[in-house]
Amino acid sequence: MTESFESFEEVMRRAVDLAARGVGRVEPNPAVGAVVVDDQLRVLGEGWHGAFGGPHAEVEALQAAGELARGATLVVTLEPCRHHGQTPPCTDAVLASGIRRVVV
């Protein structure tokens, strides 16, 4: 991915746009979007919660970023979950990825 942004506000707008893709498909869960960016706000990975019971936005974005997530920033429209349900906690994936900072 080569897209980049000028501010975290712009990155968050992108995450909100991604979240909208899940509206009507993830209930009763919230629609969530996530973007992984480097220090220059270049997009390394994106994701959204696309289906009830499926991977959450954070996991999708981290998988898209792969090893580039280490040391990067995760911008997400809702705080990462930390409970066990149909999917494992997103906080575990965030910690395992080496993300340096989370912006909500």
Task: Name each model-derived stretch.
Residues 5-27:
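Short, basic/aromatic recognition patches
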Residues 1, 35:
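RNA-binding accessory domains that recognize and position tRNA/RNA substrates
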Residues 29-31:
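Short, small/polar residue-rich loop motifs at catalytic or cofactor-binding pockets
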Residues 15, 33, 81:
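Residue-level signal for inorganic ion chemistry
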Residues 36-104:
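Zn2+-dependent cytidine deaminase-like catalytic core
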Residues 3, 22-23, 49-53:
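A short N-terminal beta->alpha junction/helix N-cap motif
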Residues 2-6, 43-45:
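A generic short-segment signal for beta-strand/edge and adjacent turn/coil regions
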